[in-house]
Amino acid sequence: EDLARYASFNGILFHDDAVLTDVDDAGQDTTRQKSQLLIGFTRTLSQAVKNIRGPQIKTARNMFALPILQPESEAWFAQNLDDFLSAYDWTVPMAMPLMESVPAEESNAWLTRLVKAVAVRPGALNKTIFELQARDWAQKPQRAVADERLVEWMQVLQLNGIKNYGYYPDDFINNQPDMSRIRPEFSSYWYPDND
């Protein structure tokens, strides 16, 4: 409520910290209950914000890729793509192949597979923002994903019909990723439909 009252914004992103794992319950049959419980909690938070800022506030929720690619893994995350698509204005899958231990040379195919898994649901791509990784957290020490790789991933998404994508994190102080190199991939002019 304090955030809604004292800050100006148009939407809320519930990040990937909103999870309940398979050890946070009393049994296997509570998987769906956990998923619905977290959605209910975020709806309560959203409504508190909308009561102050108005009904135009948009909602989005991050989601791990695994529950999309392997729906049975909902038990590990309490995340379900179909539930998210109906509960939020936007669903934001973490399209982060390196974080999922996918070898770099297989990352383009992995992204394509993720897009196709979302696309089987009618209208889902119009409510989905794919979040690429700009940092490789698996490396020790952590380092930035090469600009060339990030651009390549953006092109893979575009070639698969994706119009809504972004990246995380943005290290603007160190210009990582380099804006001059990735900016062209945010233009809709190149997009295959040229829309």
Where are these regions (language model features)?
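Aromatic-lined carbohydrate-recognition surfaces of secreted/lumenal glycan-active proteins
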Residues: 13-17, 34-78, 125-137, 168-170
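Active-site groove signature of glycoside hydrolases
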Residues: 1-31, 166
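Hydrophobic transmembrane signal anchors and adjacent membrane-proximal interface regions, especially
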Residues: 11, 29-30, 37-40, 120, ...
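Substrate-binding cleft/loops of secretory-pathway carbohydrate-active enzymes
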Residues: 22, 57-100, 139-145
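Alpha-helical scaffolding segments of alpha/beta enzyme cores, especially the outer helices
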Residues: 2, 36-51, 79, 83-86, ...
